[in-house]
Amino acid sequence: MKRTKVFYNVLILLAALLLTACQDQKDIPEVSSTEKNLVLSDHISNQKVMSICEDKYGQIWIGTFRGLNKYDGNQYHQYYCVDDSLGLPDNHITDIYRDSHNRLWVATVYGVCLYQANGNFNRVSINGSNKNIEKILEDKEGRIFFLTMTDLYQYDENTNTAIIKLSKMVEKNCYNYSCHIDRKDVMWIVTSYSVKGYRTQDLKLIVQCPVQSHPIASFLLDGHQLYISGYNGMQLFDTDTRKWGGSSCSIARLANPQRHGQLHPSVWRKRQPSA
């Protein structure tokens, strides 16, 4: 009788261990056999989301503090930096952008790359020391630009290289800035102290205006209305007339975007070209 009781206790213990092992195994993402840098999971790789973009197939790409995620409607395809030149340059994603040719660009704190149809990444060679790409932009002519805190790079299709075109665009002691390209292909860099306009054709500085209230965020609406917000309110700069101004109607469009067919700035980071 005593042996039987011990036997049953051992069976119960083994069953409990087996259930625990199965539960732990369920939480381990499945590794694809075809792509070493791809992990399949029911969860996003990291909760700190840095950028979101939709590709031409309607799949949602999410860049996080640790890893790149592609959500296909059922599960997350997670991409990581691996010891391979065909992988991501770094796990810390800063920006994702779909250009006019439906190519998907991924920027990281240590470089930028193009996603390939086979699941690999084509890394762009950078001829500068600062590889922390914070934003990817494109003008109407299809020119691709990469912005860092210190430099502006332009992509050379022939050599797959990012070439420095501008340096020291941001003033000293400025740790917050933003950048937009308007409908006339002028690149506007908003810093804590000024708004600067560069013609994308030759990146010549054509406009520089001081700003107030130390801007912390900006948003380009309709290709020419540059809204700049700071601690003391909001300013409106028209990039067509290059004058400061504002109207209750314009502010109303931001406050109630559904009535005007617009997305709110907090959820519309950039317009993406149609598929």
Model-based region annotation:
Residues 2-275:
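Carboxylate-rich, polar loop motifs that coordinate divalent cations or form catalytic acidic clusters
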